[in-house]
Amino acid sequence: MGGCMSTPEAPKKTAETKQVPSTSTSSRPPQASTSATATAAGAGTSAANGTANGIKGDTTATNRVGTSGGQGLAAALASTEPPGAQDSKGNKDRSNQIDRQLEDDQKKFRKECKILLLGSGESGKSTIVKQMKIIHQNGYSKDELLSFRGVIYKNVLDSAQALIMAMRKIGVDPEDANNRSYADRILEYRMDAGLDAVIPSEILYNIESLWHDPVIPSVMDRSSEFYLMDSATYFFANIRKIAGPDYVPDEADVLRARTKTTGISETRFNMGQLSIHMFDVGGQRSERKKWIHCFEAVTSIIFCVALSEYDQVLLEESGQNRMQESLVLFESVINSRWFLRTSVILFLNKIDLFKQKLPKVPLVQYFPEYTGGADINKAAKYILWRFTQTNRARLSVYPHLTQATDTSNIRLVFAAVKETILQNALRDSGIL
């Protein structure tokens, strides 16, 4: 695979888009004093550098094909004897041969690349797929946006009911008497099935009132004790828009809409000269047995990890820490015999939520070995180190900090990812 470097001293910025793979297996944690992981803002800046690198990669590839053909043409001309020494047929044959070689190289280069999206449940895989539609497939039509309305209503209701049940579990009631009755009403409400289902505006306004109850901040401080989807706070904050009679979700809403991925879905799009087939598979345990069908001839894996999940438990097993589950899954993927020639692009996702949570919920409570306090760079670098420790197969790993719900961030990061995929495609095609 590609060149190697030691991750504990590793990429000076996790999101830096210089395509230097990380393959370290050092057993020592990174030094807390080293700031080697970019912040969310750094992710965007360094990804911009990757854009230049990606363009450079494309230019290099083009020059490689063009130069080899040009050298062949020069050699053919240099060997041509003075006029009249040969018949024109020989020159034409040589020219045709050069043209055929150039055409063959271009056909090799235009190969289809398979990318497999892996990661535990709710790590951001499906959000990445939605971003590819927005960035590379002209986004969503109005009808497509409307198709998410029922999903968003269900997300809002499920989140409100989960919050109320959590309040009762920890023994907290709303301070406002009206909100106490609203909580009962919300908990009893059952939404109709189907994409066209709606929630009465009265229920939505009850949810808004409950969300603004004075007791809610103290409940949210204990969010590691119960399950609440990441987008809950976003939808609660936008409840008035959602409650409108003519509500049409926008792309920001769609990116945060949550549905469980079942089976395998494929998205096709072009990135420059590359034709990409991206496979999104279910992240829940029950879905992982289906992944095997996607493993053959994969160019790259994008493995998504939610940085903010370090204090959260699995949806399907409340006693299992999500970050530990992701580590186990990553270890099984990166050391699998299916991926011996595959590069792994590691998305350390949800950097925005991680930055908000870290000062309130110390990472050391869940990883006693960590010594970096509330420093976002040190914390992200430590988590990266934990993942690279599992890389016994010493595959090339390309880490990036991401915020999957931010289209501008993903656009810039994928400019860098393109270079990685491009180099693998060129290598596999025999051009490199």
From Swiss-Prot:
Function: Guanine nucleotide-binding proteins (G proteins) are involved as modulators or transducers in various transmembrane signaling systems. Involved in the mating pathway.
Residues holding Mg(2+): S126, T261
Binding site for GTP: E122, S123, G124, K125, S126, T127, D230, L255, T261, G283, N349, K350, D352, A404
Region annotated G3 motif, chain positions: 276-285
GO BP annotation list: adenylate cyclase-activating G protein-coupled receptor signaling pathway
SMART domains: G_alpha
PROSITE patterns linked to this entry: G_ALPHA (PS51882)
Region entry G5 motif, spans: 402-407
Gene for this chain: GPA1
Cross-referenced Gene3D superfamilies: GI Alpha 1, domain 2-like, P-loop containing nucleotide triphosphate hydrolases
Keyword Iron: no
Compositional bias annotation for Low complexity: 21-52
Lipid modification (N-myristoyl glycine), residues: G2
Cited Pfam families: G-alpha
Cofactors, names only: Mg(2+)
Record note on quaternary structure: G proteins are composed of 3 units; alpha, beta and gamma. The alpha chain contains the guanine nucleotide binding site.
Annotated lipid attachment (S-palmitoyl cysteine): C4
Chain positions covered by the region annotation G4 motif: 345-352
Keywords, comma-separated and alphabetical: GTP-binding, Hydrolase, Lipoprotein, Magnesium, Metal-binding, Myristate, Nucleotide-binding, Palmitate, Transducer
Name of the protein this chain belongs to: Guanine nucleotide-binding protein subunit alpha
Assigned protein family: Belongs to the G-alpha family.
CC annotations in GO: cytoplasm; heterotrimeric G-protein complex
